[in-house]
């Protein structure tokens, strides 16, 4: 009887390990690009035009690329774009008489069900932004991380930043991030942070359950060894060209927790990561389902840790920068 118990226990353990391994190796495979997703649209002289993008067709004329992931953001994205364009027009136009724009915005529409694309194009037409504001529509939803990753693969700027469509982060704080960008040809990653706001009204007035889950998430990060960054999830991160071209082709996670893999890969590559306090405010209309997405984030966090720890996902070294 004891022998059978031991055998069944070993068999059950083997099956469990196999299922865990299968989940780790198959659950977070980035979705392949679908036909037509590399085509973007923009407005020129009141007419909608299309353009097929090329991955990293870098241009020294573009100093900064702004990636904005968007899902059902027709009501919020206009204000964010106005603030963003106002800042970019002030700081990122050439000093020549023509005043050439040295910036671009790439909206990655993640299969929105509303009129997000039309709202962006109407905004672009009003300000005559032409192909400096382009919209790409994913044929099937990928999640925030997938949308950001997709956009970064087509960035052209010397630097690239992703910013949330709700405008919660003050876009003019981009200059704070630039001031803290590590010097040298490699650059690095500069992370906008809300960690300094933990005891402010913007956070305290949140619901008890939201603050409780936030603290649980931070504790889990500390347990898993991610301690050097106080706010990993703020949607306002700036990358040098070498940083974004090294990190994003190797991404696996496409959900809310993708920031953790971004920072993990940056650390593997030996890229400096600098955290900078920014101005931030709560904006209604969040797309997160609190309990469901919190559980999903915790699972994804463990998946990231286990896959890199056990070598299931390739762990790049600092010497391997491409």
Curated annotation (Swiss-Prot):
Biological process (GO), any one: protein N-linked glycosylation
One CC-aspect GO term: endoplasmic reticulum
Stretches in topological domain Cytoplasmic: 22-322
GO MF entries: dolichyl-phosphate beta-glucosyltransferase activity
Stretches of the chain found on the membrane's Lumenal side: 1
Lipid bilayer topology: Single-pass membrane protein
Functional pathway: Protein modification; protein glycosylation
Substrates-to-products reaction catalysed: a di-trans,poly-cis-dolichyl phosphate + UDP-alpha-D-glucose = a di-trans,poly-cis-dolichyl beta-D-glucosyl phosphate + UDP
Domain of life, per lineage: Eukaryota
Cellular compartments annotated: Endoplasmic reticulum membrane
Keyword annotations from UniProtKB, A to Z: Endoplasmic reticulum, Glycosyltransferase, Membrane, Signal-anchor, Transferase, Transmembrane, Transmembrane helix
Range of residues in the leader sequence: none
Transmembrane segments: 2-21
Name of the top EC class for this enzyme: transferase
Primary location recorded for the protein, binned into one broad class: endoplasmic reticulum
PANTHER family per record: DOLICHYL-PHOSPHATE BETA-GLUCOSYLTRANSFERASE, GLYCOSYL TRANSFERASE
Function statement: Endoplasmic reticulum membrane-bound UDP-glucose:dolichyl-phosphate glucosyltransferase involved in protein N-linked glycosylation.
Family membership: Belongs to the glycosyltransferase 2 family.
Protein name (Swiss-Prot/TrEMBL): Dolichyl-phosphate beta-glucosyltransferase
Taxon lineage: Eukaryota, Fungi, Dikarya, Ascomycota, Taphrinomycotina
